[in-house]
Amino acid sequence: RTLSTVANGSVDLVVTSPPYPMIEMWDSLFTALNPDIADSLQRNDGYQAFELMNRELDTIWEEIERVVKENGFVCINIGDATRKIGNQFQLYSNHSRITSKFVSLGFQPLPIVLWKKTTNAPNKFMGSGMLPAGAYITLEHEYILVFRKGGKREFTTPDQRSIRNQSAYFWEERNIWFSDTWTLKGVKQTTHGESVRERNAAYTFELPYRLINMYSVKGDTILDPFLGTGTTTFAAIASERNSIGIEYDKNFSSIISEGLKNLEKKVNGSITRRLEEHIAFCSKYQREKG
């Protein structure tokens, strides 16, 4: 619940996805951290439960303020929650609560990304079906919040500028990555076995890979304080960055170790695909534009 092993001002970029407050599959984790949360849910006090869950995350956000370098970035994937507590159904806006906390810590909120998750489930709509004034809008996106600590990062020495140039991405990648809407296939939040808690906030490899290449340079240090299955670390390795990963549940260690064993093939495949897509783009551009 703290980042005591991480030195002050040692992290260039945080990329993470925490447990989502007010999503039922995370209740057991939050109530284990603070039994008052269970009491709030039993009393049907949704607002209090929501606030107490977010206060548990606040302890990590406060630590992040300590470990992130001046001019460093924080990227957080988070979803809002809809839930019926007692007889009251409503939205619990996690992204707003987290943004408020980071602003209070002195971070600058930057433009966000909406991660649109496609779903074709015929029963995805909530409420009274075809009858008006009783149905609810279905949430089909999550947020990628972006914060900066202090002002713009400067690259003043020849070595710094050289590393920055070596870390450049392709023109067409910039156009996609810096759009405010991403459509990426998500990773189902379920167990990898009965020995592992029956949920994790795993996101697709492409999500941290993009963010790491957007907001850091080669040799930087990337932190994920909610490491889960290790995706952020894998993306950092693929991007030639250093990685610090911290995970509360020790049962994930075997999953992370297995992922590291198979990482070379995954990384090489990802880089090869990226180059092939760039070559295809250049060929198409040359045919169409001359």
PLM regions with names:
Residues 9, 156-162:
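Surface-exposed flexible segments
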Residues 1-135, 139, 169-290:
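S-adenosyl-L-methionine-dependent nucleic acid methyltransferase catalytic domains
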Residues 136-152:
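Conserved beta strand-loop-helix elements of the APE1-like EEP
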Residues 160-171:
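Active-site-adjacent helix-turn-beta-strand microarchitecture at beta-sheet edges
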Residues 152-158, 174-177:
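Proline-centered turn/helix-capping motifs that create local helix->coil transitions or kinks
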